[in-house]
Each structure stands twice: as structure tokens, then as C-alpha cells.
């Protein structure tokens, strides 16, 4: 089986769910929907459905073309909806792009050659509500180059549960510890580090498989 992910996240999801079909995903930072996608394999081969989010305009256009069966948003997921934030696009390396005020410090050199655009924000709660997402999300992937903690804070964990969460940390503190503490306090348990990602599962998610 061919992985489309950067470090095999899609294969790990399928292993975790024993090649489950018809699951539901949310991918924040979806790029063009195929290159380094954590959810394309799930949709293509296992009939998963879900939400893809990508604020960069030309990537969003490709995303809509490549993932017509997904619900696609061109917003920046954040801790408030309907705000305008400055979004840094790293020229020639747009996979390293992110919200200017949160982009990881070690990416500053990359973004010395950058383009800035204004992007409208949406919280996870509003994103899920507008998409009529189920209360149980099988897989949540967040790769936003620095704003991951703000995104997770915008989830109402009493309304939505994620069976498996992959969140990029890039070894940046205190962000990584803040993410860990937030998820642990809401019923999740750390299961593995996958290079620059941490993976968590919901404690009782076996009941949902």
C-alpha cells in the first residue's frame, strides 16, 4: 500500500483502525489534497469522508479539484471565527506557511522570502458545525506550522471526540507541552511520537471502532 503522507501517518491510521472503511477525518493544513496528504489514502481506497482546510489560494484551488468528495474550506482555523489574520506564504516552500503571529520561530529564515495575505478565520467548532460533522471524528490531523495549540483550544471536547489525533509540534516549547496538557485533560492519551508529530488517542475510542 502506497503512503501519501510525509512520514506514514495515513498507514498508521489504517493500522490503528484495522483498515476501517467509511471513517470520518478532518485535515487542517491539507495543501493540494494529495501531496503529503494524511487523508487522501483514507478517502481514495477506504471510502472515508471528511473536511480539508487550506488557506493558500492556489493550493485551495488544487484541493477542490483533487478532493471533490471532501468538504473544503479556504480559511485559517483559529481560536476565534470571522477574524482577519495575516498569513505568511513561504515562497517555493508553501508547506511551511502559517499564521504570521504563530509561525514556528525556526521557520523565520524560510519566511524571509515570503508573501503575506489576509485570511478569514474559523474555529474548529464552527468548522464542524457548518460541515454537519459527526460528534465522533475518527481522525484529526493538524499541521499548521505553529498555531496547532490555538486550533485545539477551539474544540468543545464535550461535543466532539476524536478517536485519533496527529498534531505537529516541531519540538517547539512550550507549545508541545501545552498541547499535551490540553489533550490529557480532555480524555486523551499520548501513544507515540512520529518524528515531528505527536499522536494521541481518546481513552475509550475502542468503543467507536
Which residues does each PLM region occupy?
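Phosphate/nucleotide-binding beta-alpha loop and adjacent structural elements of enzyme active sites
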Residues: 1-209
Amino acid at each position: 500500500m502506497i503512503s501519501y503522507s510525509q512520514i506514514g501517518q495515513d498507514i498508521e491510521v489504517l493500522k490503528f483502525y484495522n483498515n476501517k472503511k467509511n471513517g470520518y477525518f478532518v485535515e487542517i493544513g491539507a495543501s493540494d489534497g494529495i501531496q503529503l496528504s494524511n487523508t487522501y489514502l483514507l478517502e481514495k481506497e477506504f471510502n472515508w469522508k471528511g473536511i480539508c482546510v487550506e488557506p493558500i489560494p492556489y493550493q485551495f484551488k488544487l484541493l477542490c479539484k483533487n478532493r471533490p468528495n471532501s468538504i473544503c474550506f479556504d480559511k485559517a482555523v483559529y481560536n476565534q471565527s470571522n477574524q482577519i489574520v495575516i498569513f505568511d506564504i513561504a515562497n517555493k516552500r508553501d508547506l511551511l506557511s502559517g499564521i504570521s503571529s504563530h509561525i514556528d520561530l525556526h521557520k523565520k529564515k524560510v519566511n524571509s522570502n515570503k508573501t503575506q495575505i489576509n485570511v478569514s478565520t474559523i474555529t474548529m467548532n464552527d468548522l464542524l458545525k457548518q460541515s454537519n460533522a459527526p460528534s465522533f471524528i475518527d481522525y484529526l490531523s493538524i499541521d499548521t506550522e505553529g498555531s496547532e495549540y490555538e486550533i485545539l483550544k477551539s474544540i468543545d471536547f464535550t461535543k466532539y471526540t476524536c478517536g485519533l489525533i496527529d498534531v505537529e509540534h516541531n519540538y517547539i516549547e512550550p507549545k508541545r507541552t501545552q498541547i499535551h496538557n490540553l489533550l490529557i485533560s480532555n480524555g486523551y492519551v499520548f501513544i507515540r511520537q512520529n518524528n515531528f508529530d505527536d499522536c494521541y488517542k481518546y481513552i475509550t475510542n475502542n468503543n467507536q471502532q
